[in-house]
């Protein structure tokens, strides 16, 4: 009975939605968009796409859905519909917005494929392509190519050089050095990546087990020490080295994210999107 009622309710709901005027729904979508309710606007545009079988409103609806999805942060949907718009309308702006949606999704591999296929026909378009391509190259770790691309823009060479000096500094830190430091003196491997609290904790823990090991073999003999304390000491000693390596990778990722965001702040404002 409950299942039958649910199905009945679904049919009533669908029927009432399909009876609603398409033009009225578009008006609701546009009103929602104008007042900044982008999620609601996207919902109305989706409804029009679903129920309008004539296709008369496709161009308007797809564009509205693409923009409202982008502005609401639903970049997966905006990428899809900006791509659709590139086939429906002339102009490079929609292709560029598709690429920006992919970047917002952190889908940098597909974004790079799209930006390499992007063929602008004016100087502004070429600059847009160079900015986005350089940002993508940086995020993907191709720092030499990214720097080469940014230098072509001739925007802020001093700040750019500062960013890439920081890149070189971070890249000099290696997992092997973090492990060796931790092996020689517990805690220094963590401090190497500026995780000082973790380094102190590692030093205290391993020192405690080391002291317990010495105390045990002194009072109860080598065999008892090896059996009871040594496995724990080795576990935390080796664990400290592994932790130092992992924390270094985490530190480097954080540093590169910060540097990437600095580049975005510097260059993203130079992107100009034209839909004429």
Please state what every model-predicted region is.
Residues 18, 121, 155-157, 173-175, ...:
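General structural signal for secondary-structure boundaries
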Residues 22-169:
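Alpha-helical protein-protein interaction scaffolds
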Residues 1-26:
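Bacterial Sec-dependent N-terminal signal peptides
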Residues 60, 74, 91-100, 107, ...:
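Hydrophobic alpha-helical membrane segments
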Residues 6, 17, 34, 212, ...:
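Residue-level marker of positions within ordered structural domains that often coincide
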